[in-house]
Structures are given as structure tokens and as C-alpha cells.
Amino acid sequence: MSFKDLRSFIDHLEANGELKRISYPVDPHLEMTEIADRVLRAQGPALLFENPTNHSMPVLANLFGTPKRVAMALGKDDPLALREVGELLAFLKEPEPPRGFKDAISKIPMFKQALNMPPKTVRNPACQQVVKTGDDVDLTQLPIQHCWPGDVAPLVTWGLTITKGPRKSRQNLGIYRQQLLGKNKLIMRWLSHRGGALDFADFKEQFPGERYPVVVALGSDPVTILGAVTPVPDAMSEYAFAGLLRGERTEVCKALSCDLEVPASSEIILEGYIDPNEMAEEGPYGDHTGYYNETDKFPVFTVTHITHRKDPIYHSTYTGRPPDEPAMLGVALNEVFVPILRKQYPEIIDFYLPPEGCSYRMAVISIRKQYPGHAKRVMMGAWSFLRQFMYTKFIVVVDDDVNCRDWNDVIWAITTRMDPKRDTVMIDNTPIDYLDFASPVVGLGSKMGLDATNKWEGETNREWGTPIVMDPKVKQKIDSIWDELGIS
């Protein structure tokens, strides 16, 4: 099942007991965060706050608060089915030539899918049913959440930011938090390596001093939202990838103030520009690490137009110490990464980003070890293969007899198969998450790799331990008489 807009997904969730409407008045200032956090930690439903205090616009929260709902958004029943998305991405990143006629025939469905990518432009879109310009532009009328007591101001969290570089044919979609600064101003917090910031840097170089057009979509269809947080190949637009996942082209429309294309079914669209000479201090805000982050200067986004559907829904979230919604997204998207990594490194058995590691700061990889030093090669490969892992601080590599998703297994492997000096890799002066205050320098820190695999000749001179395993025949016999033993 595919969803053309957010509302059809809301209806689907409600019909399946995955969404709860809350009619009791709830304040976007702190109260929504507390409720959403309690519900998410209980693995509860998405929430639709129908009567936000001092606002008439409903607020949707916890939309992707469980891996199951992430899978449902992509038309899947089980998060493990998201590996199909990973297989598709792996193919798109490195398409293999057919090995023969039969192989060519088998690849036809995937090639047909790829041809279904370009977005479809529509007229009279739902997202432009109501248009506000000039003095009517007032961001304070939106029920923007103020998530934590130490936050400096309300924060737009699920804005899908749309940009285009002057030398690129495709648009970029990214999700960057945006601090409310005034009736028509937000602070665009994008880090220098992110797609939107790179597009902006290219524009400033080619058109110094000129205003840079930017559009932010709120409440887009779930597939387009997830397309913006998936490792899409650089040459492909997120719109095209969303169409690929949906099985039909993404419907877009032209923005009113510029040539950028926006998701036509979105609930709310913010159009405007960034003046390269206007910056503002952003933060502090509570973040996905569980701490308030440092402040820094970022570009100011001036909103000139607000368009929206009739009776729009405001899509929001909060970030905090895991588990939070980004952590749940990370758990689901973990399954997308597995086939992509296996394509490059077939020896990888499984890959796990524990949610306690703030979505990406720690990874555990199980491999079918084939030679001395193999674990170290896999570490280096994981750090460098996808941009998503450039901020991963710790990588643990284990053998294929260890379940990399079971901390009992992983800790056993670390404590029995590692010598701290021999089997630890330390790398200095590497890119680190800007929000990581533990690093000695902002954006620059170290990485640690832990080789918790069995050691081969050349890696040790000692006789290696043999794991204790019960005789299979004995296990089979005990299984057969277990009920007669009377042990519960």
C-alpha cells in the first residue's frame, strides 16, 4: 500500500490501532514533549493533538515512533522487509551488468522501477489552497513545539528543506532543525557537509551577495519524508527515490516565489530566501544525545510566503536521550544499510546501530573472517563507504558465531577475544558530529575500532581458545525427555 499524502497515512494508522487522537487541550510548550516521550518509550501509537493550547491547528507527533510504523509508511509489514529498500539502493549505487540473457530478464523489473522515477508536476495543488504573503506571514500562528525547559525558543523539527545548487540538475531534500526567530524568520541549522549547506555554498560562490531561494515543506507524504533521511545516491533526487519506493511518481508543484518544486500534497509550505549576510546565534537546544548543545551562528531563513491546505495539520517531533523518534528511525533504517554494506563487503553477516548509541555513534558488525587483519579492513570500509557513518565513533567487529544485536554476545566477545592494545584501532583528527561536546575540537575528534574476532595465525602466537559447545546428540535427547523431567 502506498500513501499519496500524510492524511491517507494517518487514516491507515488509525484504522490499524496505530494512532490515537487526543481531544484534551495540550500545550505545545513542554507538555506535548512529555506526553509523546512517555508514549514512545512504551512503544505506543502516533499522536494527533486535536486542540493545542492557543492554536487551532492539530499537531501530529510520534509518527515514526516505532520501527513498525516506519515500515508501514513504506508499505511494508515488518521492519526486516526494509532490506528490500537497501537492496534497491545497493543496485542503484553500483548496478551490475547482466551476466547473460536470463539475468537480464530478471533485472527488467528493477530497471522498470528505475524508469518510474521522475516527479510529476501538478496544477492546483492541495498545498496551495491557502496563500499568505506580506504582513499575513506569521510563523507564531503555527503550533511549533517548545520541547525542553532549557530550549531557547520553539523549534521546527520535521521541516523538509528543499534546495538546489547552481551547477546541479536535481534538487536536494534534507531535514534541518529551525529555530523560531520572529514572525517571518527561522534559523536554518544545517551543518557544512549536509546537502542544503553544500548547495548554499555553491550558490554563494557563483552569485556572491545574492539571496538564495529556499522552501520548507511540513507534513509531506511519509515516503517523501523518509526518502530525505535515506542514503540516496548523490546523482538521484529524493523525489525520484520516493517515487521508486511508492511505485508511482512523486507529485510536485512549483513554488510561488521561485523555481523550486515542492511536494504537492504537503500540509504547509514555507517559501523564502537566505541572505548570505544575515546570520544568527542558534540554540541551545536539547538534542538526540540527551544533552543541550552549544550555540553557534547559522543562516537566517526569511519567510515571504506561507501556503497550506485547508485545515492543515502540523507535523512535529522532539529529540532527546534515546529512545526518541530519530532513534526509532535509526533502528528501522538499520535494515536498509545491511544490503548496501554487503554489496561492497560480502563478508559482512550483519550490521547493527544500537539505539542507545544515539542512532549512529556506535556500530557492531559481524563478519565471516577470512584472513588476519580482516576486521580492521571492515572497520575502515564502514567508516569511509557511506557519509552516514563518518560520525560513527566506535565500531566493534565480531565473528559470525556472535549475534551483533545481542549485547550479551558482544560483551562476551570483547572480553574474551580482545587484547586492549593489540586489538584496538585509534584514529585521530577525524570528522565528528558537531553536537559531540566530548570531542576536543568542534567537529574534529578520534575514532576507536575494536577487533573482537577470533585471532588467526599472524595475529597471535598463542593457542586460541575453543568455545564450549554441548554434544548435539545429548541436546536432542534432553529435548525429548524435557517434559518428563517436570522442570517448568
UniProtKB/Swiss-Prot annotation:
Pathway: Cofactor biosynthesis; ubiquinone biosynthesis
An annotated GO BP: ubiquinone biosynthetic process
An example molecular function term from Gene Ontology annotations: metal ion binding
The entry's keywords: Cell membrane, Decarboxylase, Flavoprotein, FMN, Lyase, Manganese, Membrane, Metal-binding, Ubiquinone biosynthesis
Main location: membrane
First-tier enzyme category under EC: lyase
Required cofactor(s): prenylated FMN; Mn(2+)
General function of this protein: Catalyzes the decarboxylation of 3-octaprenyl-4-hydroxy benzoate to 2-octaprenylphenol, an intermediate step in ubiquinone biosynthesis.
The protein's name in its UniProt record: 3-octaprenyl-4-hydroxybenzoate carboxy-lyase
Organism this protein belongs to: Shewanella oneidensis (strain ATCC 700550 / JCM 31522 / CIP 106686 / LMG 19005 / NCIMB 14063 / MR-1)
Gene name, Swiss-Prot/TrEMBL: ubiD
